[in-house]
Amino acid sequence: MTAEEKSVLSLFMIGVLIVVGKVLAGGEPITPRLFIGRMLLGGFVSMVAGVVLVQFPDLSLPAVCGIGSMLGIAGYQVIEIAIQRRFKGRGKQ
């Protein structure tokens, strides 16, 4: 496995672990669909941090992982809220 592949996998796992922690700490009931969906969304949103390497190719892995953590925490919630609003808007029509 190359260093780039390890970086992408690290970012994905960071996002997944952040979401697992948030789901387990939250008060809402956990369903398998919700759990798996949020894990995938958090993982893929964290992987977006790899785009930073295009602008800053010499950025260290801990810095990229920090950006991935930030996106994993805030990014998936923004996307989830946008999706919920979109589907609620369709239901009212």
From Swiss-Prot:
**The protein's role, per its UniProt record:** Accumulates harmlessly in the cytoplasmic membrane until it reaches a critical concentration that triggers the formation of micron-scale pores (holes) causing host cell membrane disruption and endolysin escape into the periplasmic space. Determines the precise timing of host cell lysis. Participates with the endolysin and spanin proteins in the sequential events which lead to the programmed host cell lysis releasing the mature viral particles from the host cell.
Q: Which cysteines are joined by disulfide bonds?
A: none
| GO molecular function per UniProt | pore-forming activity
Q: Which gene encodes it?
A: Y
Which Gene Ontology CC terms are recorded?
host cell plasma membrane; membrane
Q: Where in the cell is it found?
A: Host cell inner membrane
Q: What does the record note on quaternary structure?
A: Homomultimer. Interacts with antiholin; this interaction blocks the holin homomultimerization and delays host cell lysis.
Protein name, per record: Holin
Q: Which Pfam families match?
A: Phage_holin_3_2 (PF04550)
Intervals, Cytoplasmic compartment: 28-33, 84-93
| Effect ascribed to mutating G50V | Complete loss of lysis function, no effect on accumulation
Domain of life from the UniProt record: Viruses
Q: How does it sit in the membrane?
A: Multi-pass membrane protein
One GO BP annotation is:
viral release via pore formation in host cell membrane
Protein source organism: Escherichia phage P2 (Bacteriophage P2)
Please state which protein family the record places this protein in.
Belongs to the P2likevirus holin family.
